[in-house]
Amino acid sequence: RGECHSGSKLLHPVVHLHVFNSQGQVYLQRRPDWKDIQPGKWDTAVGGHIDYGENPTDALRREVREELGITDFTPRSLGKYVFESKKERELVYVNTTIYDGVISPSTEELAGGRFWTIDEIRAALGKDIFTPNFESEFTRFIS
């Protein structure tokens, strides 16, 4: 992980999950201020690295359990793409699910989270509230 975020631009695989409720709202996590990448910004509900030898589906289930405490959900793949910033380059496997159950954000990995309406997200785009990769995925896969 450290090597991938050091500015080496080493392409590494990650999983993302966009969690919608049945009202069409999107759950976003707030990144803790201590994170090295995009601290304090609102981001995709779940995001994490795929471990060596792990497949994307297993990585997604592990990350969702670790970050939000959700174990029973049905993911749907939206595709994959390469995201590149000044510090990193990721092969992102993008997924979505509809979930109305209890969400328990990890206090170790996240600074909380909440559901946003699509209109709230659209109004906040480009205002340095969200991570660049969330904004990219929102415009590419969701809006």
Where are the predicted features?
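Short clusters of small/polar residues that mark proteolytic maturation junctions
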Residues: 1-3, 31, 82
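Acidic, metal-coordinating catalytic segment for phosphate/diphosphate chemistry
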Residues: 1-16, 22
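Nudix hydrolase/Nudix homology domain
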Residues: 2, 79, 86-143
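A short local loop/turn or secondary-structure capping micro-motif enriched for an aromatic residue
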Residues: 5-9, 34-38, 113-114
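A generic structural micro-feature
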Residues: 9-11, 38-40, 87-89
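Short loop/turn microsegments at loop-to-beta-strand junctions
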Residues: 14-15, 55, 111
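A glycine-rich, hydrophobic loop/mini-helix early in the fold
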Residues: 14-46
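The catalytic Nudix box helix
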Residues: 27-28, 45-77
